[in-house]
Regions:
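C-terminal motif of bacterial Sec signal peptides marking the signal peptidase cleavage site
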Residues: 8-12
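Acidic/polar, low-complexity intrinsically disordered N-terminal segments immediately downstream
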Residues: 14-113, 122-204, 210-215
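Active-site-adjacent structural elements in folded domains
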Residues: 98-100, 231-236
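Sec-dependent signal peptide recognition
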Residues: 1-3
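Ligand-binding face of N-terminal immunoglobulin V-set domains in extracellular IgSF glycoproteins
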Residues: 113-119, 248
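Short proline/glycine- and polar residue-rich coil/turn motifs
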Residues: 103-111, 226, 237-246
């Protein structure tokens, strides 16, 4: 009986040595990282509103049920100069905001979203004043007590351009239309749209411009005449929903 008990105790001790938490070093039990890490080029749009950019920080490792904390920091201009040696300019802190810079993960949380809000007016003006520079926001994760994946710890945002979206007709060429005398009503579709990806709900207003007709006739030596009011109709206000770049008038 004593010998049997000794064997059982020895077996139990041997098995405990091979449990996962004993095989994996403590620093790998929970590891934090940025989902879309690395260098990301970002185009901003002048819309009269702040532009937003979202990214996520994840908690992984051999035991992601553990709690964890991490902070989002920004490399200084001196650090960027030393790391890259090119004409990068770190975006001034008053040109943007972050909804949070510290992330505390509960046991059941595997990821947290972070949203950046950037001022296109301020960034665009800085780019115009210093056209040789590329403006960047070099973010990185840091934690006093938890591990960070060194390969996915940084998000280096480069501002590729600041554009003003424009709405226009998809075809601006003269399009002659022929109708038989005495017809009742005839419809024609005229395409219009946005020249960039549409992240907004755009309200478009349409009107007839007699001055444009006069200018066109004078420039091209034509004698086009405007249809009398009441002989045509169109929706003066049209919406271009988010996610849609073109539609018909």
């Amino acid at each position: 009986g004593i010998a049997c008990m000794a064997v059982l105790l020895l077996t139990a001790c041997d098995e405990s040595k091979y449990e996962l938490e004993n095989l994996v070093p403590d620093e790998y039990h929970k590891v934090l990282y940025i989902n879309n890490s690395g260098m990301q080029d970002l185009t901003l749009y002048n819309t009269g509103e702040l532009n937003t950019y979202a990214f996520s920080v994840y908690k992984g490792g051999s035991d992601p049920s553990l709690t964890a904390s991490v902070e989002i920091a920004i490399h200084s201009q001196e650090e960027v100069d030393a790391l890259y040696g090119v004409n990068y300019r770190v975006i001034p802190s008053d040109f943007y905001s972050m909804d949070t810079r510290r992330l505390d993960f509960a046991s059941d949380e595997r990821s947290k979203a972070v949203t950046l809000s950037l001022s296109t007016d301020l960034i665009g003006a800085a780019m115009e004043a210093n056209p040789e520079a590329t403006y960047v926001l070099p973010l990185y994760l840091t934690s006093e007590k938890d591990s960070v994946n060194a390969d996915k710890s940084e998000l280096f945002i480069r501002i590729a351009d600041v554009l003003t979206p424009t709405v226009g007709f998809t075809n601006t060429d003269i399009q002659p239309l022929s109708y038989t005398y005495g017809f009742d009503t005839q419809s024609v579709e005229i395409g219009f749209g946005l020249d960039t990806d549409n992240n907004w709900e755009v309200e478009c207003r349409f009107a007839v411009d007699p001055e444009y007709l006069s200018s066109y006739n004078g420039k091209h030596g034509t004698a086009y005449r405007l249809l009398p009011e009441g002989n045509y109709s169109f929706e003066e206000i049209n919406l271009l929903p988010a996610g849609t770049t073109t539609t018909d008038l």
